[in-house]
């Protein structure tokens, strides 16, 4: 989870994730929407890939990036577990 927290700590990486909510995109298309250098974008994409938040797939000479939805489900579950949210035993529900 430390890798995920580090990846999410940067506002540019969060902006990349918001852009990718619209769907799969090339690095060039992402770069067109951000005021950062392409080399900087590449570093941010690598951090997001290392955290398993983004999946990169080569299509010919182009690499396309998309959100790794399964990873977000795992992250949300881990945070909910950490906070004790959603645990029926904790809520005291009788049934």
PLM segments and residue spans:
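Residues in the helix-turn-helix
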Residues: 40
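Amphipathic alpha-helical dimerization/coiled-coil segments
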Residues: 69-95
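Core alpha-helical elements of the protein kinase catalytic domain
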Residues: 45-46, 87
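Alpha-helical residues within the helix-turn-helix
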Residues: 32, 43, 49-50
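N-terminal helix-turn-helix DNA-binding core of bacterial DNA-binding proteins
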Residues: 2-37, 59-72
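Extended rod-forming repeat segments used as scaffolds/tethers
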Residues: 17, 51, 79-80
């Amino acid at each position: 989870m430390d890798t995920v927290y580090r990846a999410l700590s940067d506002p540019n990486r969060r902006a990349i994730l918001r852009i990718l909510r619209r769907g799969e995109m090339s690095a060039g298309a992402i770069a067109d929407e951000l005021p950062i250098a392409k080399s900087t974008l590449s570093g941010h994409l690598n951090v997001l890939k290392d955290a398993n938040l983004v999946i990169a797939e080569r299509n010919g000479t182009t690499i396309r990036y998309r959100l790794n939805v399964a990873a977000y489900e795992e992250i949300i579950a881990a945070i909910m577990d950490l906070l004790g949210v959603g645990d029926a035993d904790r809520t005291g529900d009788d049934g």
